């Protein structure tokens, strides 16, 4: 970065104090600001009659920040769709004094950079959990401001980069949608006219109860909802386990959370899950390898039809009141094409899983590209 002249923010910004005059019968967007430069968004609409404290109006292209979280990157430009939205005094907004000298879009990019977040930290003070930005100190902070033509060139470059990263994400999303659609079609073909067999026959319940040593440690396993797999919980000491029963989990087990299976808390234990334990809330099934595979069953139970059957076997209200019954699970009939057909489908599942793993790495690199570029462009901007 060239040695751009430094300018106090107070020379570029002017506090906006447009008081909101609310119609009791009208609805108004309220504003919130995501952390780490992720944008200014609506937190929902509120009826004017329900607003009991003073509110201010914000306008498109104003700079707005959170007094509490500006030091965590909660700062940005008000988007056009939130013109006329309302905020509390915890969200000061600022007009630009001279847009023909200071590009609004340039500042919009600058405030998303880590150097600017450091500037906000320097303008904040207070004790733990009460740290807030001080507006006067904020406006006294200086930024390096290039000539307008250079500002516009930087904005064009960053806009182009942002669009490219968006296109990469959109392409990966489209490829994965196509892959999931292909998988669904292949599964439909695989189970067409397949006989139904009960879970008790194809993947019976297995319980490996663990004896508890008070001096021992027992790492637990968790299951994410919506088919998101397993995760590791911190280990429990024997004394923490107390009288609770723990059951050993082995790789390849088909796992159900008895309280959240109805929302897709169904997974297969991975090799890295070996040596972990589940409570009585875990239902562990072992696929009969002469008839089926855990991967095929998992896919089925995460389809609309499979989840409907799990829901029917989980009576009760919402949340933890919906408990999957063991006998009801074992009675569920699942489609059983030939083992060869299931294995062919599983190979396709594995190929798509590998594709998604590659995409994850690409997404991570893509997500890091813009922040790294902002860091490079605005290094020394304070």
Language model features: what each stretch is:
Residues 1-20, 140-156, 160-210, 331, ...:
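Non-catalytic DNA-recognition/assembly elements of restriction-modification systems
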Residues 7-21, 31-60, 200-211, 216-251:
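Sequence-specific dsDNA recognition surfaces
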Residues 26-27, 78, 216-217, 269:
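Short Gly/aromatic-enriched secondary-structure transition segments
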Residues 47, 52-53, 81, 128, ...:
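A structural connector/turn signal
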Residues 55-56, 60-116, 251, 255-306, ...:
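A short beta-sheet element
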Residues 71, 85-92, 125-149, 276-282, ...:
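A short glycine-rich beta-alpha junction/loop motif
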Residues 312:
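Disulfide-stabilized, aromatic/cysteine-rich ligand-recognition loop
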């Amino acid at each position: 970065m060239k040695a751009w002249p430094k300018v106090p923010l107070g020379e570029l910004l002017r506090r906006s104090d447009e008081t909101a005059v609310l119609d009791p019968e009208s609805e108004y967007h309220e504003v919130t600001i995501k952390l780490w430069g992720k944008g200014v968004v609506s937190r929902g609409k509120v009826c004017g009659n329900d607003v009991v404290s003073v509110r201010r109006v914000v306008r498109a292209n104003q700079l707005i920040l959170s007094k509490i979280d500006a030091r965590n990157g909660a700062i940005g430009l008000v988007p056009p769709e939130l013109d006329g939205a309302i905020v509390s005094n915890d969200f000061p907004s600022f007009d630009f004094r001279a847009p023909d000298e200071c590009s609004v879009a340039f500042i919009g990019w600058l405030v998303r950079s880590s150097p600017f977040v450091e500037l906000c930290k320097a303008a904040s003070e207070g004790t733990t959990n009460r740290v807030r930005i001080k507006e006067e100190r904020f406006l006294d902070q200086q930024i390096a401001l290039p000539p307008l033509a250079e500002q516009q060139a930087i904005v064009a470059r960053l806009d182009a980069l942002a669009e490219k990263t968006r296109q990469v994400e959109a392409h990966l999303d489209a490829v994965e949608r196509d892959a999931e659609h292909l998988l669904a079609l292949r599964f439909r073909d695989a189970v067409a006219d397949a006989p139904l067999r009960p879970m008790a026959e194809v993947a019976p319940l297995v319980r490996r109860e663990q004896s508890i040593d008070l001096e021992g440690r027992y790492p637990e396993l968790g299951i994410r909802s919506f088919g998101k797999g397993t995760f590791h919980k911190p280990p429990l000491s024997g004394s923490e386990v107390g009288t609770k029963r723990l059951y050993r989990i082995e790789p390849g087990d088909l796992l159900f959370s008895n309280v959240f299976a109805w929302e897709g808390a169904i997974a297969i234990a991975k090799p890295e899950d070996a040596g972990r334990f589940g409570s009585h809330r875990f239902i562990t099934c072992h696929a009969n390898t002469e008839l089926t595979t855990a991967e095929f069953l998992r896919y089925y139970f995460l389809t609309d039809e499979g989840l409907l059957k799990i829901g029917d076997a989980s009576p009760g209200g919402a949340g933890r009141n919906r408990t999957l019954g063991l006998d009801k699970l074992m009675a569920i009939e699942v489609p059983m094409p030939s083992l060869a057909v299931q294995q062919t489908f599983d190979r396709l599942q594995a190929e798509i899983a590998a594709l998604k793993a590659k995409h994850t790495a690409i997404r991570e690199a893509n997500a890091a590209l813009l922040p790294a570029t902002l860091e490079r462009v605005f290094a020394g901007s304070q």
